[in-house]
Amino acid sequence: MFNKHSVEIDWGGRPLKLETGKIARQADGAVVATYGETVVLATVVAAKTPREGVDFLPLTVDYQEKTYAAGRIPGGYFKREGRPSEKETLVSRLIDRPVRPLFADGWRNETQVIVTVLSHDMENDPDVLAMVAASAALTLSGAPFRGPIGAARVGFMNDEYVLNPTLDEMVDTQLELVVAGTADAVLMVESEAKELSEDIMLGAVMFGHRHFQPVINAIIELAEKAAKEPREVSQADDSALEKEMLGLIEGELRPAYAIADKQQRQNAVAAAKAKVIAHYFPEGQEPKYDKLRIAAVFKHLEAKIVRWNILDTGKRIDGRDAKTVRNILAEVGVLPRAHGSALFTRGETQAMVVTTLGTGEDEQYIDALSGTYKETFLLHYNFPPYSVGETGRLGSTKRREIGHGKLAWRAIHPVLPPHHEFPYTIRVVSEITESNGSSSMASVCGASLSLMDAGVPLKRPTAGIAMGLILEGSRYAVLSDILGDEDHLGDMDFKVAGTEVGISSLQMDIKIAGITEEIMKVALAQAREGRIHILGEMAKALTNARAELGEYAPRIETFKIPTDKIREVIGTGGKVIREIVEKTGAKINIEDDGTVKVASNDGEAMKAAIKWIKSIASDPEVGQIYEGTVVKVMEFGAFVNFFGAKDGLVHISQLAANRVQKSSDIVKEGDKVKVKLLGFDDRGKTRLSMKAVDQQTGEDLEAAGHKAEKADAPREAAGE
C-alpha cells in the first residue's frame, strides 16, 4: 500500500530519521523527520502553472505547533489552536530565509511549505528539525529548488561548541546560534550571545556548517530513492533588451544613483522608469514586451549600475566609502510622561523608542509547547507606512515586524540585569518614524538609550549595525551601515549587535548561493569598527543608566515572608490581600517561594502595604510597644487591633494607672491607642496593656520605672 523510503543517521549523539511515502502522499513532497522523540511533518505543494501578474517568487512557509504533540489540550474557550504564536511566526521565517534564494530564477508558481510538529520530547527543539524536514520535502517535490540545505543549532559551554544542545542545556549556554546553508556555503544565521568575540561567533557558524553536512548527505540519499523529476523553468534571454534599455536611460539612471537624498533619488529613478514605459508602451500601439519583463530588466539594470559603481570606484549611492557610517544624532528624555525615551537618528533612518516599567501583573504569560512561563522583557517593533513615505493599511502585526522586534530583543536581552536584582516587567516599543535601511539596528541603539534613560541598569550600552555585500565573481565589497537600496540591490543583509566587549546578537541573510568564511570574517571585523563608532556617538547622549527611576515609574520593594504565612497574607478567597490593595493603592505580587513584590508610585502607600504584610507574616514580640485601634469595648476591657489582623484584649485593669469603673470612660471604638504586649494566657489569647505605655510619647513606662528604681538604689544604700 505504501511505497516507503527512509534514511537514518546518527547526528549529535541522537538518531535522525527522514521518511517519505507513507503520510501526505498527495503533496508534491512530504517528509516525516524524527530526532529523538520529536517528530515533524513537512509538506510541499507547487501550483501547476505560474501565477499571472507577479514578478517575485510566490513562496509561503507556515510552521505550526499542535498541542497534542506535547500531550496537552489548548487553553481558551474553543480548545483548539488559533492564530500563529510568536514562536510559530519566527520559525516560519527561519525556514523561509535560507530556502528562498535557492529557487530557480523565473519560478512564479505558487509554492507552499507547511511544517507541522506532531511530537515534542521536551529535549529537542523542533525548529531546526523543521528546517531539515522542509529542505528534504522541497528536494523531493520536483520544484526547481537548488538545495538541499542543512541546519544546526550551536551552543557554547565551558569554552566548547555544542551541537544541537537540548532545552535543558540551553539554560547554561553562552550562545544560541542557528545556522543553515548548502554543502558549500552558509545562507542564514540567527543568534543570541552573551557578549562573545567575533572569533567565537565565526567559529560557531563554521562549526555548525561542518556538522550539518551529514544531514545534507542524508537528504541527497533520500532524494536518489524518491525524488520527482525537476520541473522546467523557462527563462527568456534578455541580454539584447537590457543593452537597448541601457542605451536609452543610462544618462538618467546612472546620475540618479549618485543622489544622496532618498526621496530625490527615488524621484529621479521614477523619471527614468517613466521614460522606459513611454518608449516600450507607446499609446495606441501593440506593446512588443510584457510589462513584468520590462520591469525585471529595469531592476536588473539598477542593480548592475549600483553594484559595479561600488566595485569600480569604492563610492556608494550617498557618496560614502565602504566603511563609513552615516551621521548619527542620539537624544534621550524626549517624551515628558514616559518612564524612559530616546530618539535615535542615523542618516534617513530614525527610531523613537520608549521604555515602560511595570510590575508582576504586567508579565506576559507564554503558553509554549515546551511548557508555560512568564516573560518579563518585551520589545515591540512597529513599522508604519509613513516611515517610507507611503500610504498603507494599519492592522495586525506583520511577520517582518515580529522578526525585527525579536532580533532587537535578542540584542538587548543579554545585557539586562537579573530579574531578582531589578524586579520590573520591562516593555520597550520601537516606533520607526523614518526608514532608509537598518531600522532594526536603530531599534537596538534606541532601546539601549531608552532603557538607560528609564534607569534600567544595563551591563553596558548596546549598539547595532547592518552590513551589506556586493559580490561579483572574485571581487567583493563589504558595506557598513547599508541604505535601503543597498539592501535591495545587494547580496547580503548581515546585522551585528553588541557592546564594546562583544556580540550579543547576529543575524545574516544571503540572497545568493552563499558566502565564504573569508567574507564573513571581513564583515565581522568591519562591523566591530562600526559598532564602536556608534557607541561613541550614543555616549554623547547618555553613557550609563540614570541613578534614579523616571518620575512616573512605579517603585518596587522586594522581601520574603515564610511560605507557611502566604495563606494568611492572601486570606480566604483573597480577602486580606484585596483589602491591603484597596486601602493602600499598592500593587502586590506574591510568589510561591514567599517572595513579595510591592509596587506603588506613592512612597507612603508602599510603606503602609509592606508594614501590613509583614505584620501578618510575622508574630508580635512580648514586651514591644505597638500602635493599635480599639475595635470593641466590653465591660471587662477593650479589644485592640494592633498587629496586622491580630487583636488582643486590654483588660479593664490595664486601661489606666488609676482604678477604672467603666471601660467606656477611657476608650471608645475607633480610638488610636498605644499598647504593650504582655504575653499570652493559657488559651493563647493575647494580653495587652495601655497603662504600661505613655499614650502621648509611646514610652514604655514599666521600663522607665525600672530604670528609675535602679538609679535610686545607690542613694538608698548610702542612707540618703
From Swiss-Prot:
UniProt-listed PROSITE patterns: KH_TYPE_1, S1
GO biological process per UniProt: mRNA catabolic process; RNA processing
Enzyme class: transferase
GO molecular function: 3'-5'-RNA exonuclease activity; magnesium ion binding; polyribonucleotide nucleotidyltransferase activity; RNA binding
Localization annotation: Cytoplasm
Residue positions binding Mg(2+): D487, D493
Positions of the S1 motif domain: 623-691
Primary location class: cytoplasm
Record-listed E.C. numbers: 2.7.7.8
Annotated region described as Disordered, given as residue ranges: 691-720
Key word Nucleotide-binding present: no
Cofactors demanded by this protein: Mg(2+)
PANTHER family: POLYRIBONUCLEOTIDE NUCLEOTIDYLTRANSFERASE, POLYRIBONUCLEOTIDE NUCLEOTIDYLTRANSFERASE 1, MITOCHONDRIAL
Protein task: Involved in mRNA degradation. Catalyzes the phosphorolysis of single-stranded polyribonucleotides processively in the 3'- to 5'-direction.
This protein's name: Polyribonucleotide nucleotidyltransferase
Top-level taxonomy: Bacteria, Pseudomonadati, Pseudomonadota, Alphaproteobacteria, Hyphomicrobiales
